[in-house]
Design a protein with these regions (language model features):
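Residues marking helix boundaries in flexible regions
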Residues: 343-345, 353, 362, 371, ...
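Ser/Thr/Pro/Gly-rich low-complexity, intrinsically disordered segments
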Residues: 349-350, 363, 385-387, 395
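Short hydrophobic alpha-helical segments enriched in small aliphatic residues
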Residues: 359-361, 369, 386
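Short, intrinsically disordered C-terminal tails of secreted or membrane-associated proteins
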Residues: 397-406
Length: 407
């Protein structure tokens, strides 16, 4: 009971801090700019709709739609990363790293060039469908690679290469576009929350809201899947259908972001990692809303910095998210490497100290939730095994000398 009380208090504390920071950043985003508007004036304009026409236009037509779209898309991007990390069982997986954002960017660029030849503007729904199609194409190639490549690091490199290919195709298409189309594409392809209208906010809120609700419905299967496929199957989870749903939901989140704001980097990796460490848990029912709120706070804060750091010049949103997100990813990779080394050392120590028979290894590791699968017997004196820890899905390969370890 005491531990539960402490845990719940920690959860409520994290949510309270995130909510307070969220409100503070919303006010700062509306308050700051070339025209300063005080907090009392903001409250009067928002709730009483009283103020000068200039102030009303600045808040209702420019700043408020921008901050809302940043919050919605930031939360969507963070959850897209969380779902991909669950799918691949790797904290480095994200829509930008795996080339999913680049695939969406490629298809949106094609859609914009084609539709702008015949129409003056492109519907938000058309952009979302195009981005979703591009996301699914990239995911399809990654899944094909996953059937051939078991090493996660190599798979991530493959995702990066797919991203480069999609970016190259996008650049090739833009080269042959008309000058007016190039201007629109250039601003969008750099990543920005500027120029958003209320129609954009409504469409994004509708798409992201529906996908968020569906993600909540998957919270229990996600929790079971985090403990390993075998455990999830024993709990009645249809693994094949579940994995398809993870990919679809992640692609919808990523497509919404790319369709409206262009490619935004590192949010899908950095935010879920930070949220899990702040909460001290990976329970989906707690992590999903916290990740969405954390992504909203992160993107709104980065957008504020992008607008005000070198005003009146405005930075690309991806520039700012990379500055703050990349160091977090580097730290995460170093920390995971150290954990893997410690884990390997502990397994080796046990094998050397305790194992006297082949069966002992299987019994001990299976008892402690570790799946021990023979991969290849290279020779009479050497065995190759893959040890997969079901709780954190870290994979290591142990090459053991039969004469030394299995005496």
């Amino acid at each position: 009971m005491k531990n539960n009380w402490k845990r719940n208090t920690r959860y409520m504390g994290v949510f309270a801090v995130l909510a307070a920071v969220f409100c503070m950043i919303v006010v700062l985003n509306i308050n700051t700019g070339n025209v300063q508007i005080s907090v009392p004036e903001i409250l009067r304009i928002l709730f009483l709709k009283k103020g000068t026409q200039v102030q009303m236009n600045i808040i209702w037509k420019i700043r408020l739609p921008r901050v809302l779209i940043a919050a919605i898309l930031g939360g969507a991007l963070a959850l897209s990363g969380f779902l991909l990390q669950t799918f691949f069982s790797n904290p480095i997986a994200g829509p930008y790293v795996l080339g999913i954002s680049s695939g969406a960017k490629m298809m949106v660029a094609l859609a914009m060039i084609i539709f702008l030849k015949y129409y003056t503007s492109v519907s938000s729904y058309v952009l979302i469908v195009a981005a979703f199609t591009g996301s699914m194409l990239s995911i399809g190639f990654i899944l094909l690679l996953a059937r051939k490549i078991r090493n996660m690091a190599t798979l991530l490199v493959g995702g990066i290469m797919i991203g480069y290919i999609c970016s190259a195709v996008t650049d090739f298409v833009v080269t042959f576009a008309e000058d007016s189309d190039i201007v629109n594409l250039h601003g969008w392809s750099q990543g920005s929350f500027s120029g958003m209208s209320w129609s954009n906010v409504k469409v994004a809120a509708l798409m992201v809201g529906i996908t968020l609700i569906l993600t909540f419905f998957l919270s229990k299967p996600i929790g079971a899947y985090q403990l390993g496929e075998m455990y999830a199957q024993s709990m009645g989870v249809n693994i094949r259908v579940f994995r398809v749903l993870l990919i679809l939901l992640s692609s919808v989140f990523s497509a919404c972001v790319t369709a409206f704001a262009g490619p935004v980097s590192f949010v899908g990796i950095a935010v879920p990692y930070l949220i899990k460490h702040l909460l001290g848990t990976a329970k989906p029912l707690v992590v999903i809303p916290a990740t969405f709120l954390g992504g909203a706070v992160f993107c709104m804060g980065c957008d504020l910095i992008a607008r005000m750091a070198f005003a009146p010049l405005e930075l690309n949103i991806s520039t700012v998210t990379s500055i703050f997100g990349a160091p977090i990813v580097i730290f995460m990779m170093i920390k995971n490497t150290l954990k893997n080394k410690i884990r390997i050392a502990l397994v080796f120590q046990f094998l050397i100290a305790k194992c006297r028979m082949h069966a002992d290894i299987f019994q001990f590791l299976n008892y402690h939730g570790i799946t021990f699968l023979p991969v290849d017997i290279a020779s009479q004196f050497q065995l190759s095994y893959v040890v997969k820890h079901s709780c954190n899905c870290k994979i290591v390969t142990l090459l053991m000398r039969k004469s030394k370890l299995l005496t």
